[in-house]
Amino acid sequence: MNIVEGKLSLNGDEKVAIINARFNHIITDRLVEGARDAYLRHGGKDENLDLVLVPGAFEIPMALNRLLACSKYDAVCCLGAVIRGSTPHFDYVSAEVTKGVANVALQFAKPVAFGVLTVDSIEQAIERAGSKAGNKGFEAMVTVIELLSLYSALKN
């Protein structure tokens, strides 16, 4: 049996965008730092990495659609933080950003990673943005890197 899987290395020419929601920026800025660190550690070049800022997580799918449609990027890493409050707003935003990113990703043959935190508290967000639970931005970019390699292997 042949096994096809992606590798965790870049050749340096891959053009990657990070979409980052500014809302809850204390958390999302740390996710961006983690994603950038992963990209550079695995062979990416800083000049091939773009950061696209959107107001909040709800706007991520719209920006993702534009980025993938323009053919400038090989992959996109989506980052944000939706923290539960006392209203149903959390449920609506979490569901729509998740469905939106999935729907857009399926329209294009390019790697997309979902690094949007959906958490019950600011403490959980902090844990996932670089403390106890690692940095989910780093993990999302590692997913992008592996998918870039996998997509390349599947083309050949």
Swiss-Prot record:
One of the record's GO cellular component terms: riboflavin synthase complex
Active site: 89 (proton donor)
GO molecular function, one term: 6,7-dimethyl-8-ribityllumazine synthase activity
Top-level class of the enzyme under EC nomenclature: transferase
Binding site for (2S)-2-hydroxy-3-oxobutyl phosphate: 86-87, 128
Keywords, ordered alphabetically: Riboflavin biosynthesis, Transferase
InterPro entries: LS, LS/RS, LS/RS_sf
Binding, 5-amino-6-(D-ribitylamino)uracil: 23, 57-59, 81-83, 114
Keyword check for Transferase: yes
Gene3D superfamilies linked: Lumazine/riboflavin synthase
Enzyme Commission number, as recorded: 2.5.1.78
GO BP annotations listed: riboflavin biosynthetic process
Pfam families linked to this entry: DMRL_synthase
Domain of life the protein comes from: Bacteria
Similarity comment text for this entry: Belongs to the DMRL synthase family.
Official protein name in the record: 6,7-dimethyl-8-ribityllumazine synthase
Species name: Sulfurospirillum multivorans
Origin organism lineage: Bacteria, Pseudomonadati, Campylobacterota, Epsilonproteobacteria, Campylobacterales
